[in-house]
């Protein structure tokens, strides 16, 4: 290998972009097969290949940043910009769902009974499970901030406690959301209310699961001494993502659960 006279990481040849693209092709083709042929085999294969690709690719990134020292300050700065742009793209993603909700709710059409919620829809009580979910996510936001301060102060014990608590709160939120879905008196097929409710809250729930896995990975890396008080961007990215999930939930709660009911 030739001498590298700069601080930027030149990525080694990797098969994971190719396997990731193949997994995406299998999953999208499998989704069409599931819809039209009622067969999940192709989508399951794509999902397995995608999970294996994610594991191997992220393992390589951890190895490069933690053990090989490739994540210099300029590289970390680039990763920060990348994470910020990713979160901005997620904001745009959820903005579409809120647009659909407010487009339907602010000017209900005659098909909806000129009222919101539409005629025949019994919305959930915003002061029961949704309010508990709000408290759970806000508490998890506090605990992940506690974990961040503990890392910067080199307090391993409190970092472990705070990260464990955050992951448990994320799992508790997911369990409450599943229970709520089972108890809803309407379905996704019940017009624009049902579709906007389940798509918006469902994608948020998916992001909570992803964020919980992100933080669980950070906890396992922390237990193996991968983070220092100065070098812990993997955790920072997870914390940013988690705070983003918290903020989205507050907008969902105020818009769909409270105002929309």
Swiss-Prot record:
It is an enzyme of class 7 (translocase). The chain crosses the membrane at residues 16-34, 41-66, 73-105, 129-152, 156-183, 191-223, 233-256. Residues 35-40, 106-128, 184-190, 257-261 are mitochondrial intermembrane. Its EC number is 7.1.1.9. Keywords: Membrane, Mitochondrion, Mitochondrion inner membrane, Translocase, Transmembrane, Transmembrane helix. The keyword DNA-binding does not apply. InterPro entries: Cyt_c/ubiquinol_Oxase_su3, Cyt_c_oxase_su3_dom, Cyt_c_oxidase-like_su3, Cyt_c_oxidase_su3-like_sf, Cyt_c_oxidase_su3_a-hlx. PANTHER family: CYTOCHROME C OXIDASE SUBUNIT 3, CYTOCHROME C OXIDASE SUBUNIT III. Component of the cytochrome c oxidase, the last enzyme in the mitochondrial electron transport chain which drives oxidative phosphorylation. The respiratory chain contains 3 multisubunit complexes succinate dehydrogenase (complex II, CII), ubiquinol-cytochrome c oxidoreductase (cytochrome b-c1 complex, complex III, CIII) and cytochrome c oxidase (complex IV, CIV), that cooperate to transfer electrons derived from NADH and succinate to molecular oxygen, creating an electrochemical gradient over the inner membrane that drives transmembrane transport and the ATP synthase. Belongs to the cytochrome c oxidase subunit 3 family. This is Cytochrome c oxidase subunit 3. The gene is MT-CO3.
